[in-house]
């Protein structure tokens, strides 16, 4: 969840107006009454949202259309427990009258400017999409949602007839929503046409462990309908999505409705799995601190949900909006319910604090991650998601962050933002949380079992709420530091498909995502925003890591040092993400991690290893003790634009039993 304060502003404004209403007209002089009327008029437009969005990259050549999603929300939210949801009683909103939507397109870059002629999708000579019926605007009482299926051939034809120098691989769209008595609502999107497939390795499937659909629906955050989500995810190169809609926005009926929608959309092209993002009370201070957790269903029955012990028909965990009147469920109670259902969980953005307006905080290493006594990970907790949001840059202009139109202030467009840099946040999260947990998991066992005490896995998720082209946010931290961002919002270059968890599933994802869930539960995954690096021990020396006796990420191997087979590496990148610049091997012990070891990357194989590449670990591990250790790897690439991309593997645990 992205921290925000929209509902706080909404509630504050409503309280002011409510006080004015309570006082009555006679309590004000004429000038004062005029001010009240102005405030009432402004509030009448509060909660009206316009959105236009499209996939950042079109990677599926089988889809001949470019989907542009348009949404208008006239101040109505679905039933939820969010703070301020009852404020609408104070607000009178007139219906909106939609005339239509104009779409303009041009090649990307400042050399080209939009023409005055829209891209026409039908016989209309005025709108790309004409909403009028019999010449009358379409009346919107509460919500309007439509996906404009723009033929790719129409885009190519338009560009060829209006611009020289094609064909063009990157194009800019200007989407103008026209509503009576409102200024034109303009959105600017950048799209890669015919983008190449993402790097792939057989039996590994890309997905997102943290994505919000339209079932996340509150005054602060909303996702997109599942059919829109599915189409965009396929274009982005995803194989599966774990839907993690907020526990504050769900009800038993809505959770069942979401599952019904998921089932209808299962056709073998993209696997949708219904999960949940649960707001919980931290063990540090249940009255003050809330944290978030990604809840995943049982791999044995992905559609089961999380049945309540007293009422098995209620399969959704409903808890916590940050308000004192609706306290969050204790973290341990939620984990108990999830594990009782056969599910598991990941700590969501554990070290990115949630907005203090929502009483949000960070996960505590000792109280939240570890079970009482500090000897084990909390039951049901598989790991953590410190790689949350693929953000490198932010922009003040949340409708044109790419500076597509002529811009008066280029500083309002995407600029590198160290405070939100994904690698800085990820490495800090690894240092604060993952490393200490991995280290504690290497402590000696007291039961005589020859295995690590416990394992903790890493996952990556976009945390996108719709956000197909870029992410639009409102952040209380930026509000306190920069008023314009608090009032007008800002943009991040995060989007669906920009970051993924890649799961190992040799039997495929499964008819309901069973194998995706097993891989997530067992740490058979890597995190990536482009390249893929996998590692393992080929125990039968047949040149494959896909046999049952082979050992891969998330697993362990115990053998004498002299019998330890080479670690086999395999990687793949592409021109889009650039050749491998480095592979770092990191060894972790019960006293901490050793300095990274640079693994040589043959220049001829910088884009792809083209099979397994062996690495002898015996020299690296020769001084190790006969206790459990782990190894993990980080690969980095750099493309022609000097952008860096990475892949982080989960560990392999190793015990050397002798010389």
Across the structure, where does each feature detected by a protein language model lie?
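Cleavable N-terminal signal peptides
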Residues: 16, 25-27
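Histidine/acidic-residue-rich catalytic or RNA/ligand-binding cores of hydrolases
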Residues: 218-220, 284-288, 356-363, 394-404, ...
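Bacterial N-terminal signal peptides that target proteins for export
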Residues: 1-11
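Substrate-binding surface in catalytic domains of secreted glycosidases
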Residues: 385-446
């Amino acid at each position: 969840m992205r921290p925000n304060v929209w509902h706080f502003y909404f509630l504050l404004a409503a309280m002011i107006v409510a006080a004015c209403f309570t006082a009555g007209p006679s309590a004000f002089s004429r000038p004062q009454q005029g001010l009240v009327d102005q405030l009432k008029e402004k509030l009448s437009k509060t909660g009206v949202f316009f959105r236009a969005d499209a996939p950042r990259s079109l990677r599926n050549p089988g889809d001949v259309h470019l989907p542009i999603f348009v949404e208008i929300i006239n101040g109505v939210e679905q039933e939820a427990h969010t703070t301020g949801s009852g404020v609408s009683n104070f607000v009178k909103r007139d219906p909106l009258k939609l005339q239509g939507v104009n779409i303009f397109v041009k090649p990307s870059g400042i050399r080209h400017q939009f023409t005055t002629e829209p891209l026409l999708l039908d016989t209309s000579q005025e709108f790309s999409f004409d909403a009028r019926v019999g010449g009358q605007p379409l009346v919107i009482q509460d919500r309007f949602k439509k996906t404009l299926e723009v033929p790719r051939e129409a885009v190519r034809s338009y560009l060829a007839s209006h611009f020289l120098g094609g064909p063009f691989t990157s194009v800019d769209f200007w989407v103008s929503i026209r509503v009576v008595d409102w200024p034109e609502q303009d959105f600017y999107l950048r799209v890669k046409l015919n983008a190449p497939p993402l790097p792939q390795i057989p039996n590994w499937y890309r997905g997102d462990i943290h994505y919000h659909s339209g079932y996340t629906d509150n005054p602060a955050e909303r996702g997109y309908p599942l059919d829109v989500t599915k189409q965009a995810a396929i274009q982005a190169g995803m194989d599966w999505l774990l839907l993690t809609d907020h526990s504050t926005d769900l009800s038993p009926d809505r959770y069942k409705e979401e599952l019904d929608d998921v089932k209808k959309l299962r056709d073998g092209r993209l696997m949708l799995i219904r999960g949940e993002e649960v707001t919980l009370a931290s063990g540090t201070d249940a009255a003050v601190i809330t944290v978030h957790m990604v809840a995943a269903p049982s791999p044995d029955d992905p559609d089961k949900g999380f049945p309540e012990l007293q009422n098995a028909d209620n399969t959704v965990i409903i808890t916590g909006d940050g308000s004192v009147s609706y306290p969050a469920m204790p973290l341990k109670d939620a984990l108990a319910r999830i594990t009782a259902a056969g599910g598991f969980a990941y700590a969501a953005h554990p070290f990115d604090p949630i907005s203090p307006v929502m009483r949000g905080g960070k996960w505590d290493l000792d109280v939240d991650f570890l079970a009482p006594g500090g000897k084990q990970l909390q039951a049901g907790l598989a790991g953590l998601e410190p790689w949350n949001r693929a953000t490198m840059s932010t922009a003040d202009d949340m409708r044109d962050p790419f500076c597509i139109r002529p811009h008066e202030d280029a500083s309002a467009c995407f600029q590198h933002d160290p405070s939100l840099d994904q690698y800085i946040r990820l490495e800090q999260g690894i240092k604060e949380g993952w490393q200490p947990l991995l280290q504690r998991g290497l402590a000696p066992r007291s039961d005589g079992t020859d295995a690590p005490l416990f394992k903790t896995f890493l996952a990556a998720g976009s945390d996108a709420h719709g956000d197909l082209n870029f992410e639009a946010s409102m952040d209380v931290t930026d509000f306190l530091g920069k008023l314009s961002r608090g009032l007008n919002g800002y943009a991040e270059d995060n989007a669906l498909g920009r970051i993924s968890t890649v799961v190992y599933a040799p039997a495929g994802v499964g008819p309901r995502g069973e194998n995706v869930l097993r891989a997530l539960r067992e740490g058979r995954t890597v995190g990536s925003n482009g390249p893929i690096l996998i590692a393992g021990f080929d125990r039968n020396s047949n040149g494959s890591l896909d046999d049952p006796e082979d050992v891969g990420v998330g697993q362990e191997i115990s053998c004498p040092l002299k019998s330890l087979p080479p670690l086999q590496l395999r990687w793949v990148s592409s021109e889009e993400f650039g050749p491998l610049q480095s592979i770092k091997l990191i060894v972790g012990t019960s006293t901490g991690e050793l300095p990274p070891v640079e693994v040589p990357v043959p220049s001829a194989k910088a884009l792809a290893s083209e099979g397994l590449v062996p690495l002898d670990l015996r020299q690296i591990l020769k001084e190790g003790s006969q206790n459990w250790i782990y190894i993990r790897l980080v690969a980095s690439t750099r493309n022609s634009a000097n952008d860096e991309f990475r892949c982080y593997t989960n560990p392999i645990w190793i015990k050397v039993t002798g010389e």
